């Protein structure tokens, strides 16, 4: 049973997140291992396994990029374990340049430049994310898979920039 079916939701990217949360809570109550404490060992094991599946499904469906990857996996794209990556050389060059810029910002400890960088990367991510949503809605799976691969790069870059932001904040607070 796929995660969408488990939660009684249509297999599409855009979800009713409130319905997802409510269904998660219902499933947690229904299959909580403590409810099966007096059951047979097989029932206890089944409850633990079902609970683990519910938690994994919840983590996957509530995170937008993971949900997109999962939806694509249902259509034959195993992005989590695939070997090939983005083939768009212009995009890859842009990523290298952005990484170099982030390194320069770190060396200079330039908080204002970092703030501007983070905003720029967020805008790039949001633009590609909107494109991905349209591609998934239109069931253009190949294009959506390519966009998800690019979003992974941007997500990692954004995460690195936010970690640097925390590091610079700690540096400024400690004064060293």
Swiss-Prot record:
<dbReference type="GO" id="GO:0051087">
    <property type="term" value="F:protein-folding chaperone binding"/>
</dbReference>
<dbReference type="InterPro" id="IPR004640">
    <property type="entry name" value="HscB"/>
</dbReference>
<comment type="similarity">
    <text>Belongs to the HscB family.</text>
</comment>
<protein>
    <recommendedName>
        <fullName>Co-chaperone protein HscB</fullName>
    </recommendedName>
</protein>
<comment type="subunit">
    <text>Interacts with HscA and stimulates its ATPase activity. Interacts with IscU.</text>
</comment>
<dbReference type="InterPro" id="IPR036386">
    <property type="entry name" value="HscB_C_sf"/>
</dbReference>
<dbReference type="GO" id="GO:0001671">
    <property type="term" value="F:ATPase activator activity"/>
</dbReference>
<dbReference type="GO" id="GO:0044571">
    <property type="term" value="P:[2Fe-2S] cluster assembly"/>
</dbReference>
<dbReference type="GO" id="GO:1990230">
    <property type="term" value="C:iron-sulfur cluster transfer complex"/>
</dbReference>
<dbReference type="InterPro" id="IPR036869">
    <property type="entry name" value="J_dom_sf"/>
</dbReference>
<dbReference type="GO" id="GO:0006457">
    <property type="term" value="P:protein folding"/>
</dbReference>
<keyword id="KW-0143">Chaperone</keyword>
<comment type="function">
    <text>Co-chaperone involved in the maturation of iron-sulfur cluster-containing proteins. Seems to help targeting proteins to be folded toward HscA.</text>
</comment>
<dbReference type="GO" id="GO:0051259">
    <property type="term" value="P:protein complex oligomerization"/>
</dbReference>
<feature type="domain" description="J">
    <location>
        <begin position="2"/>
        <end position="74"/>
    </location>
</feature>
<dbReference type="Pfam" id="PF07743">
    <property type="entry name" value="HSCB_C"/>
</dbReference>
<dbReference type="InterPro" id="IPR001623">
    <property type="entry name" value="DnaJ_domain"/>
</dbReference>
<dbReference type="InterPro" id="IPR009073">
    <property type="entry name" value="HscB_oligo_C"/>
</dbReference>
């Amino acid at each position: 049973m796929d995660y969408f079916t488990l939660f009684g939701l249509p297999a599409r990217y855009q979800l009713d997140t409130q319905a997802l949360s409510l269904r998660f809570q219902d499933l947690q109550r229904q299959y909580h291992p403590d409810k099966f404490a007096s059951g047979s060992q097989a029932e206890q094991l089944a409850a633990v396994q079902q609970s683990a599946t519910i938690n994994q499904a919840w983590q996957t469906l509530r995170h937008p990029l993971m949900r997109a990857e999962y939806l694509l996996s249902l259509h034959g794209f195993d992005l989590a374990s695939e070997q090939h990556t983005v083939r768009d050389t212009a995009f890859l060059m842009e990523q290298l340049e952005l990484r170099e810029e982030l390194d320069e910002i770190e060396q200079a400890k330039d908080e204002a430049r970092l703030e501007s960088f983070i905003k720029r990367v967020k805008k790039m991510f949001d633009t590609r994310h909107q494109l991905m949503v349209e591609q998934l809605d239109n069931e253009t799976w190949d294009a959506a898979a390519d966009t998800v691969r690019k979003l992974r790069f941007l997500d990692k870059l954004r995460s690195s920039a936010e970690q640097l932001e925390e590091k610079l904040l700690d540096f400024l607070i400690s004064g060293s």
